[in-house]
C-alpha cells in the first residue's frame, strides 16, 4: 500500500474513533461538578435553590391539577434532571437563558398569575424536590450532563442521534396524548415575523416573497422539526421555537393571506424526560432513580 493511502486510512480511522467522544463532550462535563451559589437569569440574580425551584415550577405549569403525594417521585426526578443540567451549563460556561441548550424559569409573579390560589401547593412540591435534587447531587459518568425536560411530549421523543444528545432515549409516550394541553395552535403575522427576525438579525435583508419566509423544514422520521430556513437564515428548530414561542418541534404549518398558522402537539423540547409521563410512572410506584433511568442513558 502506498504511504499516502496508508496515512489517509489512519486519519479516517482516527476521526471515526474520536467523533463519538466529541459529541459526548458537547453535552457533558467531566470536571468536578460545581454548583453555583447564585445564577444570573435575564439580568436578575437568584439564589441557586430558588432558581431550581422556579425551573421545576415552569415544568409543572401544564398540569391539569395540583400535584399529589403519589407524584412526588416524578417531581423529584424532574428536579434532579434540571439540577444536573444547571450544573452542566455552569461548568461549561454557557448562558442559562440564551442559545442552546438552556432552561426555562418561572418567577414568583408569573407563578402567582398562572397557578393563582393553588400557588402554595405547587411551590411546596417544587421546593421539596429542589432540596432533594441538591442533596442527591447526581453525577453522570463522573461529571454533569444536560438532561432535557419537556412538559408534554408529542407522543414520540427525538432520538439521541437526531438531538445530538447521547444521554436521551427515543421513547413512545402515548399517555402524553391524554394531557389537557397536548394540542395547541399558534399564528404568526408576516409583520410580526419580520420584526422578530430584524431584532435578532439587524443586518438581515428580508426576502420579498412572504409565503416562503419559513421553508425547507427538515424533520426526523417521526415528523419532529430539526432545522428550517427563516427569511434566508438556516437555523435549528430550538432557535426557531425560542424566537417565535412555538411550544414543540412537532408541528404542521400552513400559510395564507400574510398569516402563518401552526398546529402543534406537545409542549417542550420533545427530547429527554416528559414531565407528564414521569408523574404517571410515579403514580405507578416508580422511584425517582427508576424514572430517571426510563428517560436517560445514565
Each predicted region: which residue ranges?
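Conserved, single-site charged/polar hotspot
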Residues: 1-298
